[in-house]
Structure formats: C-alpha cells, structure tokens
C-alpha cells in the first residue's frame, strides 16, 4: 500500500469520529430534550448550531493556521476534538452543551478543510477528484456505524456516554495521524490568509459554486435532520427500528459517496446537476414511500444514496478552481466550501424545523425538493463563468 493511501486512511479514521459527533444528535434528539428539559426543536439546534459555528468559525480559524506543519496541526486538532467531546459528555446545561458543540464544530471545519487540500495535493493526477471522497468516506461510514451505534448507546446507557465514546474515537484518529502523516510535510502557506477570504469570494465562479453547495447539500437535511420523529410519527415504527433504519441509510450514503468519488474525477458540472435533480426526485418519492409499511425502507435507502453523492465533486471543484484563480488561498477556499456545506445543513435543518412546527412533518420532502431545484438553477449560472 502506498504512503498516499495510508495517510488517506488515517485521515478518514479521524473524519469518522468527526462525522459521528456531528450527526449523532439526530438519533438522540428525544433523549437529550428530555434530559435537558427543552423541546425537540430546540435540541435540533445541536445540529443546526454545530453547522453554523463550523460555517462561520472554520474559514476564520483556518486563515491563521497556514504556518503550522500539517502533522502538528492535525494531531493538535484531533486531541482538542477529543477533549471537547468529553466536555460535551459532562455539560450540566443546554447552554454549555451548545458552547462545547460550537467549539467542536470549528475544530471539525479546520481539520476537514486543511486535510482536503493536503490530500488533494498528494493524490496522483487522475485521482485528485476523488481525494476528498476519502474524508467524506469517514463521514459516511460514521452514518453507517457511528451514528446508529451512538443512538443505540444513548438509548441503553444515556446520551452522555455517546459523547464520551466519540472522544475516545478522536484519540484513535489522533494516533493514526501521528504515525502516518510525515513530519517533513511543510506548511501549505507562509502567511496569514484572513484577507484571502475576501479574495476568494470575489471570484464569481467560486462564490456561485459555494452557493450551489449550500443549496444542494442543504436540500436533503430538511428531512434528514428530523428523520427520527418523521419515521416514528408518520411511518409509525418503533425506537429500536429507527436505529436499524439509520444503519440502512448510512450504508447507502457510503455507497453514494463511493460513486460520487469516481464521478468527481471527471470534474463535470453536468454530473453535479444530475445529482441535484436526483436528490429532488428522491425527496418527492418519499411522500409515497415513507408512510407505507415496508416501502419506507426503499425510501430511506434512496435518500441515503443521493445525500452525499455530490460532495466530493463540490470539494474538489473548489480546490482545483481556486488553484487556478487564487492559488495562495486554497486552504481558505476549502474551508469556505466546508462552510457552504454546513450552511446547507444549518439552513436545511432550520427550514425543516419551521416547516415541522408550522405546516407538518409530511411537507418536509416537498420543501427539500424545491431547494434541490434551486441548486440546479445556480449550477446553470456557474456554467457562464
């Protein structure tokens, strides 16, 4: 096995821990809400707030780490990630839990942004598109094993134990980076990149791609953030069954990510538009599948298949485009794309909460599909540049 693949696996192990902590509250909304004496909608902010903190904080924080060698940066980030998850496990109040989650989100964003650029630069020429799929692979495998296991652990032992275990996962990621990422890796830049944020977003091709990422990724989170109450209230399945349905979802997310990684090597905008269209169609199909016994499994599988399929293309497109238009600011551009994806999570979750509160759970797929169609419209604008 080449050194590139060993490093890719070590970074993917780290993003597995990161993906688990990002999405595991989705499966524990009811339990955390009960323990903290707040509504399920408020606990949904643990997902939305995480995404917002990452979206706002990651580009700013990333702009200050350019002088740090990658191995040192990655190990410190994973150690801090572990500490913050333990802090979440012992948080005595909802407010403090939100704070620890926010700081964890910033660490997540910086790690993912810098690791994406690092791995893309290391990849062979014909594999640069799929380099980001290794990191997204860690996130998607987290949806298969990490999130369902965390949900199960939360049901059996308590949600605090789940965060403590995720902290231990972070230490495993720290160790993997420590032994695989070479010390000789030089810092990617030699100066502060804070002004690079402005430089990057002033490029229409980049800023429109970021908007496309927000809409395209956010479309699926209108429904996914509230998939547990949807399955329990609309489909009518038990709490135990939800865990296994989340496993099914995660399996198909992983399959979709692998397919998306291969597609990313083509760097085709038409492929991204096709993914967004598929997401919209799949959401509409949920109206027919999710309420029906047995058929809801097909609905969840299709939803998982398309959910992350475009992410590797979006991440690699930003890195490669920025290398062409603003080569000194690839780390910041990568962080901005991570922000765009998380604005999508936050926006999708927030819109989903509003729809759930004022219209009803059954309307979530329709709203998600409409947002996906907006992403296709923005992709048409990107073609002009």
Task: Describe each PLM feature range.
Residues 321-359:
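A late C-terminal transmembrane helix in Major Facilitator Superfamily
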Residues 94, 100-139:
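Cytoplasmic helix-loop-helix junction between adjacent transmembrane helices
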Residues 206-247:
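Extracytoplasmic gate region of multi-pass secondary transporters
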Residues 56-95:
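Conserved MFS/SLC helix-loop-helix module at the cytosolic interface between two early adjacent transmembrane helices
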Residues 7-43, 58, 223-228:
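Extracytoplasmic
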Residues 9, 80-87, 92-104, 294-302:
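Paired small-residue
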Residues 167-186, 379:
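C-terminal membrane-cytosol helix-exit motif in multi-pass small-molecule transporters
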Residues 37, 69, 90-96, 107, ...:
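Helix-breaking motifs and short loop linkers at transmembrane-helix boundaries and internal kinks
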């Amino acid at each position: 096995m080449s050194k590139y693949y060993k490093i890719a696996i070590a970074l993917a192990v780290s993003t597995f821990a990161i993906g688990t902590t990002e999405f595991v509250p989705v499966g524990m909304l009811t339990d955390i809400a009960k323990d903290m004496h707040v509504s399920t909608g408020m606990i949904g902010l643990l997902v939305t707030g995480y995404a917002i903190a990452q979206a706002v904080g990651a580009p700013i924080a990333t702009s200050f780490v350019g002088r740090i060698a990658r191995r040192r940066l990655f190990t410190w980030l994973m150690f801090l990630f572990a500490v913050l998850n333990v802090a979440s496990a012992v948080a005595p109040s909802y407010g403090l839990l939100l704070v620890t989650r926010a700081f964890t989100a910033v660490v997540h964003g910086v790690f993912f942004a810098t690791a994406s650029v690092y791995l893309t630069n290391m990849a062979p020429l014909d594999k640069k598109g799929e380099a980001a799929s290794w990191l997204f692979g860690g996130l998607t495998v987290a949806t298969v094993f990490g999130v369902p296991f965390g949900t199960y652990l939360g049901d059996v032992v308590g949600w605090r134990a789940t965060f403590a275990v995720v902290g231990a996962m972070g230490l495993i990621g720290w160790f993997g980076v420590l032994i695989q990422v070479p010390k000789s890796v030089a810092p990617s830049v030699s100066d502060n990149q804070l002004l690079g944020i402005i430089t990057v977003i002033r490029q229409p091709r980049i800023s429109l791609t970021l908007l496309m990422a927000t809409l395209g990724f956010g479309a699926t989170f209108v429904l996914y953030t509230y998939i547990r109450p949807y399955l329990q209230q609309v489909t009518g399945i038990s709490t135990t069954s939800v865990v296994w349905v989340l496993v099914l979802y995660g399996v198909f997310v992983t399959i979709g990510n692998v397919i998306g990684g291969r597609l990313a090597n083509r760097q085709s905008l038409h492929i991204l538009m096709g993914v967004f269209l598929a997401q919209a169609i799949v959401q509409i199909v949920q109206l027919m599948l999710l309420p029906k016994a047995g058929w809801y499994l097909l609905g969840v599988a299709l939803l998982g298949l398309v959910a992350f399929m475009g992410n590797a293309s979006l991440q690699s497109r930003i890195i490669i485009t920025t290398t062409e238009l603003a080569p000194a600011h690839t780390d910041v551009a990568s962080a901005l794309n991570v922000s765009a994806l998380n604005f999508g999570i936050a926006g999708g979750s927030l819109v989903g909460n509003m729809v759930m509160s004022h219209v009803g759970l059954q309307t979530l797929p329709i709203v998600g599909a409409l947002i996906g169609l907006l992403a296709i419209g923005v992709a048409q604008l990107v073609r002009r540049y």
